[in-house]
């Protein structure tokens, strides 16, 4: 439920078995939940990033840090009053917030609705690779610039797709065969990534305290659009990707990424095999999930 666009008095059920609050909620909702606490059943706070430490994550845009920190700060006391338990999405978050006795709730892949899905028999576009990051991944977007430039020079048939605003378009404008797509909402992106097809997806993750607490959800995105993935050999991917089987782990050295991308683009059959194993892992291997 999108609490930003709904009135709790009109949209909340008569009785709920459990209420999950993800990251933060508007004060109006938190105050209403406090008054109507008897209708809520169990109330769980789900932390899927290190939101309390976001202000110190200098790799994130300042505006994003300030907005996220303020939303968390103003509702913190009410959340502490309301919530029975805390769920976290990664072992690193569980370690950092051990004083809250959190329960580990690792993300797992949920297939998109059938009406959104492309055909699994549909082949990915050969020599097509992509990075689907947001403004919160600006350092990775900048880090990939020389990598993409070298790959495009080495593979004249290669096409690269990235998401971003005018800043990203300006950054990549001199590199041939690069498509910069405008940012999307999550429902829009889910629909898009369920129908588009690429041969290779990139998931660089620079080694910072904030990134080390992230989860491995890029694996699900990359697999959804039919691609094999290249992932940073660091948290959160180092413990999740089986190198050479469900993806490739690569050190955060740009020349290593150039070599790995070029090699993978020139071997579409191997990319297909890696994607198939990753898809099987996404659908059949699930991490920890607390009992309700």
Please place each PLM-identified region on the residue numbering.
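Conserved catalytic-core segment of nucleotide-activated headgroup transferases in glycan assembly
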Residues: 1, 109-195
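N-terminal pre-catalytic "stem/leader" segment of glycosyltransferase-like enzymes
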Residues: 1-29
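Membrane-proximal helix-turn-helix segments that form the acceptor-binding/catalytic region
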Residues: 35, 51, 65-85
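Active-site proximal beta-strand in glycosyltransferases
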Residues: 37-57
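Donor nucleotide-sugar binding/catalytic pocket of nucleotide-sugar-dependent glycosyltransferases
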Residues: 82-117
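Conserved acidic donor-binding segment of nucleotide-sugar-dependent glycosyltransferases
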Residues: 241-254, 262-269
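A charged, aromatic-enriched C-terminal amphipathic alpha-helix characteristic of glycosyltransferases
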Residues: 251-252, 266-292
């Amino acid at each position: 439920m999108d609490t930003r666009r709904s009135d709790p008095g009109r949209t909340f059920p008569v009785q709920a078995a459990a209420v999950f609050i993800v990251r933060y909620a508007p004060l109006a909702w938190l105050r209403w939940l406090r008054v109507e606490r008897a209708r809520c059943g169990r109330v769980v706070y789900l932390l899927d990033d290190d939101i309390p430490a976001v202000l110190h994550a200098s790799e994130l845009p300042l505006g994003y840090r300030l907005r996220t920190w303020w939303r968390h700060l103003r509702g913190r006391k009410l959340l502490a009053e309301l919530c029975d338990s805390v769920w976290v999405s990664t072992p690193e978050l569980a370690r950092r917030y051990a004083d809250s006795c959190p329960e580990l709730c690792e993300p797992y892949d949920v297939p998109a609705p059938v009406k959104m899905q492309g055909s699994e028999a549909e082949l990915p576009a050969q020599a097509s690779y992509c990075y689907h990051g947001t403004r919160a991944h600006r350092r990775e977007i900048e880090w990939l610039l020389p990598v993409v430039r070298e790959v495009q020079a080495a593979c004249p048939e290669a096409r690269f797709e990235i998401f971003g605003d005018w800043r990203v378009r300006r950054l990549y404008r001199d590199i041939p065969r690069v498509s910069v797509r405008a940012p999307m909402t999550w429902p829009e992106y889910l629909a898009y990534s369920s129908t588009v097809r690429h041969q290779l997806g990139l998931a660089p993750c620079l080694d910072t305290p904030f990134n080390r607490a992230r989860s491995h959800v890029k694996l699900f995105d990359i697999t959804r659009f039919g691609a094999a993935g290249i992932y940073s050999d660091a948290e959160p991917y180092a413990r999740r990707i089986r190198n050479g089987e469900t993806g490739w782990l690569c050190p955060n050295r740009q020349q290593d990424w150039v070599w790995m991308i070029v090699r993978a683009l020139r071997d579409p059959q191997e990319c297909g095999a890696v994607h198939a194993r990753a898809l099987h892992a996404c659908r059949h291997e699930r991490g920890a999930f607390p009992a309700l």
